[in-house]
């Protein structure tokens, strides 16, 4: 089955970050579902009070498995649990107006371009999906994310991690998927 998440593009339209994501899911006896998710995350954020701007865009990938929790495994509806391992390697830019040096006077530039970073994380997944018509299915998933490892650039934490979300924000996330069983 191939699917797309519809929340990410909507999030990108109404906020300063979001993502495009597609998934490939294999059905093993209506019980186990190995999953590969590939996406492209973007952020273009500005803080009005500090005038600091943050920008990134990069691909990310997740791999994992779901399992059907229902007793009747062959039903048109599925209740599933699972996990994912996620990874992204990305660059980001931080720009800001110069800072006034209080000791020596004058302006000191502040910002960085092309700061390299990477992130590894795990996700616990719980969700439902249902057959809508023919091969078309729709469903949602709720995700709890936990960072495993990270490499931040020389200027500290990035504002947004493609595929993971905002740093320092909620560890909770979700998807709303439209899937085509092939």
Where is each model-derived feature located?
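Short glycine/proline- and aromatic-enriched beta-strand/turn motifs that initiate or cap beta-hairpins
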Residues: 1-28, 177-182
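Short sequence motifs at beta-strands and strand-loop junctions characteristic
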Residues: 14-16, 55-57, 112-121, 166-170
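Extracellular loop and loop/strand-boundary signature of outer-membrane beta-barrel proteins
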Residues: 7-10, 47-54, 108-114, 161-166
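Gram-negative (and chloroplast) outer-membrane scaffold detector with strong preference
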Residues: 32, 37-105
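Outer-membrane beta-barrel "beta-signal"
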Residues: 62, 66, 168-182
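Outer-membrane beta-barrel proteins
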Residues: 10, 28-30, 66-72, 89, ...
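Outer-membrane beta-barrel pore domains and translocons
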Residues: 5-9, 39-41, 68, 84-88, ...
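Transmembrane beta-strands of outer-membrane beta-barrel proteins
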Residues: 2-4, 34-36, 61, 77-83, ...
């Amino acid at each position: 089955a191939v699917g797309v998440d519809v929340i990410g593009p909507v999030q990108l339209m109404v906020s300063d970050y979001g993502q495009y994501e597609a998934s490939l899911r294999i059905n093993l006896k209506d019980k186990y579902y190995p999953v590969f998710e590939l996406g492209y995350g973007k952020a273009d954020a500005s803080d009005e009070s500090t005038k600091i701007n943050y920008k990134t865009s990069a691909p990310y990938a997740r791999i994992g498995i779901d399992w059907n929790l229902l007793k009747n495994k062959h039903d048109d509806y599925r209740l599933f649990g699972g996990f994912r391992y996620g990874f992204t390697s990305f660059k980001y830019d931080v720009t800001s107006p110069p800072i006034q040096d209080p000791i020596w006077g004058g302006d000191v530039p502040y910002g960085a371009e092309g700061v390299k970073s990477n992130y590894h994380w795990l996700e616990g997944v719980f969700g439902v999906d249902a057959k809508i018509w023919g091969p078309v299915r729709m469903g949602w998933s709720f995700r709890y994310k936990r960072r495993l490892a990270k490499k931040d650039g020389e200027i500290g934490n990035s504002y947004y991690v493609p595929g993971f979300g905002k740093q320092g924000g909620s560890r909770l996330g979700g998807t709303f998927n439209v899937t085509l069983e092939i």
